[in-house]
Amino acid sequence: MIDAWAIKRALCIFILINCVLKLGRSRKITWKPKKGVYIPLDDANGCKGEWKRKGVFFNIQSGKKGKRLKGRKGLRRGLVTRGTPQFRRDKFIPLFLLQDCEHRSLNGKQYNLRGRRCSSPLDVNPRGWDILPPEQPNEETIGERIGERIGEAEQLEDEGLDGGPPPGMEAKKSSSSSSSNNVHSNCSDAGKAPVCSQENIRNFCILAHIDSGKSTLADRFLELTKTIKKKKMQDQFLDMMSLEREKGITIKLKAVRMNYKNYIFNLIDTPGHFDFYHEVKRSLSVCEGAILLIDGTKGIQSQTLNIFMELQKHNLKIIPVINKIDLNICRLEKIENDLLNKFHFMKKDILHISAKYSHGVESLFQRIVSEIPSPAIKSNSFFRAIVFDSFYDQYKGVILIIKVLNGVLTKKTEVFFIQSEKTYIIQEVGYLTPEMKPTESIRQGDIAYVSSNIRKCDEVQMSETIISRDIVHLNAQRRLVVDSDLLRRNPSGEEHINVKRCNIDSSLGGVAPRMERIEREVNLEEIAASKVDVSYPVVFCNIYSVNDKQANELQAALNKLKLNDASFSFKPDVCETLGKGFKCGFNGLLHLNIIQERIKREYDVETIVTAPSVNYLIRVKEKCIDKQLKERLIDASFDIANINVEGGDHDDCNDNGGSNSDDRSDRSGKNPPDGLYYMTSNVNDIPQKNYIHGIYEPYVRTSIMTPEEYQKYIMAECFQRRGIFIKKESMDSHIIFYFDMPLSEILINFLDQIKSCTKGYGSMSYENFITYRESDLHKINIYVNNRSIDSLSFLAHKLNYQEKGKRIVLKLKEMIKPHQFLVVIQAGIGTRIFASERINPLRKNVTAKCYGGDITRRRKLLEKQSAGKKKMFSIGKVKLPPNMFTKLFDLKAQ
């Protein structure tokens, strides 16, 4: 009798085996050969399929010598041909190595993949090897290649089987990629030692107003020159910082080296926001030309005017380009007329492009090659370079971004820093492509990076000049000399040194020093490079760590940020309420916001930022100076002759008033009144009225561009903020207003008001040139429960100090939570209070248990509670929120 359970058991086993077999036919097989598993090709004659690994061919299917590879279970005849195998780096070979085999296409390249189910194309390129030469090698060539590599079969396991493409493939890849990049044969790859002539180097930057398409154009440069592979390409590729991608703006300048035909392009992408204008200035100092990009939908804007003036000051070649011509709202003819009338360009010089769709970018390449000059070449000269940017690397220390002015620099070379008077050994040199790619040497005209294992951030200064160490040394008196007998003082009292000549015609592409002396003497000023333009901070505030234990971490973070941002400055400061902190200087509120966010993200330090302020000039009465104030004046002493000072408040704030001259020289050279001056941004350092003659606040020349229909709103807003009208200019349907505005008035919310008045069509920018004007300013103190909060004190003009004080008090009332005691918030000038608000205390219902009886019992409980509240009012501490200053003073990124 047949057992039913046995039948069921056999049926289940049959189904299970069938499923396993189906799974085996459809599964992806990743076969990794090991020692003893494969058979060299010459030992398996007549096999139907071969694989190549590091120049050695192996069979993976059975041949005449064995139906199964030794020691490898499961690799029976035909098993690998089933299903859709997953091919790894060592799993494919070019088609011409195996004749009469089925194949599939891989990105335009054909590879052998013998089997019945090999009709669908591969969707990924495991290695990215390029097409091998079309001509097929004969059998003798293949046999010789196999014979040369057959001895490496036993070493494959030790060398690792995933370690890169075979040598033959590698060579073919490099040759193919060089041809695909359209690079001339005498120009090397960006990561290798340069062999291009210096006449073929083009150093240029892209400049424009905010949101004009600078980063998009930089993407097209990277894409069309094939500097970045297509699969790695993404929008705004050079904006690598997370903050840049979140906010959609460029914060830091980015240098990148590209190859175009037989030319080398050193491109610098710059920010557009005025708070990062110092990045633009540093870029112009190391370039020979610039692309002036104009938004085709908005035309010339206020920042465009400042950029054009800066380009003229540096005497750089300008290529005007109108972007976004693919949009229907592009005003091409109008913008062309504005460029012709305002900037006096020729119509044939103006290019029309669409950076998004690469239209016209190739023509821009030709203009760069033909119009932007190559760097100045000084043959037979020692190495000299200037530092224009730097950043800190965890493993390599301080990385310096330099421009080589003359000479050649190689690794392991000893160099001398002129400003810091220190010597370092170069550990690594290379190019930014945009990643750091080491090379053997860099030469004059190149924009490159160097690493010397510098661990202290304060040892490197912006505009530092680096020269060869073998031409100078320090004697016992710490003086710069070449040899002990070469430094001498001539009758005129000037110091000179002699330098060695260098032969740049070395066959190895390097520099061989020659020992003869040059006849003329080189002055020290000639060796030091001209300084890179650096903007000085205009906004100041104090930064404290929320946790006092992180004060040292905050200092280390600020040191590294200063290394990467030359316009940022800081010095230690101590506050009674907030502890140890730092007084920091910024170029604007957006700059402040970015620095605070970078401290939090990159260094994991929570910070408290105080109210922003500007530098005020104080004229003190010498007879009324006490000892404490005198000590403070000594620390803050400076040369008043270098400050442009104008006396008295100006009443010419109307359409007809003010000067009609825009010449900067008219605003300089004013002689300040005699007296003792000092400068401070800390309101608490300003003494009382009876100790000073006056307070001078900074004014800046501000340009505002607006459509004609909104000009009355712009005028009203500027006069409300105490602006002094200078002049106005007409440009087609737009008007440009020039005002001298108090710096403290335009920092907070002024741009927002301009955008609001003009429905988003207005733009604003201001110059760095500052004039100090005497103003009737009052120090406003903020009191919380009769205690002055020094970090909340600020200066306000007599016209609007009451309005500002009341607004601060009302905001504090909204931000401070109720306490167990009464909280009184007041604003006053000295002892005179002009604004006050109260936050009632939290109260417990102490009379809830009284259901009847005499009223005295109820009154007694209330009086006891009131007495406790009064006691807490005198000894209690009010808790202020840590983000109070940001909300209180509207520290929004302009």
UniProtKB/Swiss-Prot annotation:
GO BP field: positive regulation of translation; translation
A GO cellular component annotation in the UniProt record: mitochondrial inner membrane
Domain tr-type G: 199-376
Enzyme Commission numbers on file: 3.6.5.-
Pfam entry (one): LepA_C
Extra remark beyond the main annotation: This protein may be expected to contain an N-terminal transit peptide but none has been predicted.
Function in brief: Promotes mitochondrial protein synthesis. May act as a fidelity factor of the translation reaction, by catalyzing a one-codon backward translocation of tRNAs on improperly translocated ribosomes. Binds to mitochondrial ribosomes in a GTP-dependent manner.
Protein name, UniProt field: Translation factor GUF1 homolog, mitochondrial
